[in-house]
Amino acid sequence: ILSGSFGARLFSNIRSKQGLAYDVQGGVGFQWDYPGMAVLSMSTKTETTGAGIESLIREARDMVKNPPTDEEVEKAKSARLNSFVFSVDSPSKVLGKYLTYEYFGYSSDWLSKFKKGIEQVTTEQVREAARKHLRPEDFSILVVGPRKGTASALARYESVQELDITIPEPS
């Protein structure tokens, strides 16, 4: 609903309508070590960093204020199931998935359970998940870019921690 297709909310509003990003994504993360972590991300020009952050936050709030429709949920389910096919379209990809599942302790029938689980998701479950988990007041914001162009955009946030991620020259 937030991303994954050209009609998704983030893509439609932030990329198409506002022109703030070429790449914008979001959803509930499916990381093995942090399952369920909500992530919104975009690539934008330095000078539109502030507007981009505000747009991402606004879209998160809008998922609660204007919850997904039945049509949005069905489209999202279909897109997820259809895209999943490409992650298992070769023997090496299937083997890789099974090895990953084994490593993280998932059952051998996890793939079929996953598919059935997606098919059974209801609009009300999506709405409840948005209400429960998309809380911009709890967001951590990560900006990668030059301080010169992003400092003023970040000044409005309570605590900004600067990290030097410079890659040293090889010696």
Where does each model-flagged region fall?
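His/Glu-based metal-binding/catalytic segments typifying zinc-dependent metallopeptidases
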Residues: I1-R9, S171
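M16 family metallopeptidases and their MPP-like homologs
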Residues: L2, F11-V121, P136-V144
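Short phosphate-engaging motifs
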Residues: F6, T48-T49, G149-T150
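Proteolytic maturation boundary segments
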Residues: T123-S171
